[in-house]
Amino acid sequence: MSRPIRFGVAAHAVLDADEWRRLAQRVEHLGYATLLLPDHTNPQLAPIPALVAAAAATTTLRVGTQVLCNDLRNPVIAAKEVATLDLLSGGRADWGMGAGWLPADYDGSGIPFDPPGVRVRRLREAVELMRALFDGHPVEHRGEFYRSTGVSGTPRPVQRPHPPLLIGGAQERLLRWAGSVADIVSIGPSWQSRQIGPYPP
């Protein structure tokens, strides 16, 4: 199956409201398809409210997370935030998720930085739970990491069954899983330096 290639801009250090809106408008004007924000505890905008503002300042630009750090929020809350972003953007959201990789995010939040295998298993379970919540029906979930009793995913996203799922990561096991479940897989050359060769001096 062929899919169109989309080009996007990943923003990081904008902290001014007017500058953020202008950046979103500029990205759209230049013809990029998507504006993406990461999810870290360092000085940067919180992704979901910032992306709602970017969507409000534009008309066609897609907005998404690259990626939500799964361990920084419960998947029930994350599903509500992503669905709200999709609703308020008129169906222009991309749903980006990652297992978490930056120790500073965990240290600053007081969250244990578990081994990669544990974080990946938790991400897989969170994505499964969020998919169920996007359906809008009451969800009963008893998993290794999460429990949910009778909560309904509201609001429902505009895009059905859910916004395009972007999984970010570098670990081979995670990328194999991402290739089987995600609409978009985000990898960076710096994460794969052993496969493509070292950086130049």
Task: For each feature predicted by the language model, list its residue ranges.
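Active-site-adjacent structural elements that line small-molecule/cofactor binding pockets in enzymes
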Residues: 1-201
